[in-house]
Regions:
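Residue-level signature for tetratricopeptide repeat
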Residues: 18-21, 55, 91, 125
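Alpha-helical adaptor scaffolds
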Residues: 47-111
């Protein structure tokens, strides 16, 4: 038997996509079982490790999810890595591990600076950690960066100035 692939083949991607599409968020155990079985067929595959973690996370079993996210992250890249970092940071927040969550989001935002979702979830972690001013500043900058309406553009300097002020409180 040869080495087990840690790649995401088109076939494996289709299998993962189908299982994800068919999951029942109210009853995640069949999805957990499916991905755990798939992992036995592809041991150490980071993409499957991520999906197992995500399934446990959705089921409310955050401590278990973290184990899988941590195993998956070194082997992931691109959008899957971004999603794993987001879910990992969010899960740490849900477990009141705010400093760790914020470290994950700081690194993730540096690696994926164009990710709006990372910035939103970073703001949630800042808020949960009691840093409401910095959370609001993060969201204000997101609005200024991404909401290009005439009204926002007119007040962009004021929005950015307020964001800077809040971030430094």
């Amino acid at each position: 038997m040869g080495a087990v692939s840690t790649e995401l083949t088109p076939e494996l991607a289709a299998t993962i996509e189908e299982a994800f599409a068919n999951r029942d968020r109210a009853n995640m155990q069949p999805t957990i079982d499916f991905f755990a079985d798939l992992l036995t067929k592809h041991p150490g595959n980071p993409y499957i490790l991520y999906e197992v973690g995500g399934s446990y996370d959705t089921a409310g079993r955050e401590e278990k999810a973290i184990e899988y996210y941590e195993q998956a992250l070194p082997g992931l890249s691109g959008d899957t890595k971004r999603r794993c970092l987001l879910q990992y940071g969010s899960t740490l927040r849900n477990l009141d591990r705010f400093d760790e969550s914020l470290e994950v989001f700081a690194a993730a935002c540096k690696e994926f600076p164009e990710s709006d979702s990372l910035r939103v979830f970073k703001a949630l972690s800042l808020q949960a950690a009691g840093r409401k001013d910095k959370a609001l500043a993060t969201l204000l900058l997101l609005v200024a960066d991404r909401l290009a309406t005439p009204e926002i553009k007119r007040y962009e300097a004021a929005i950015r100035g307020n964001a800077e002020h809040l971030a430094n409180l």
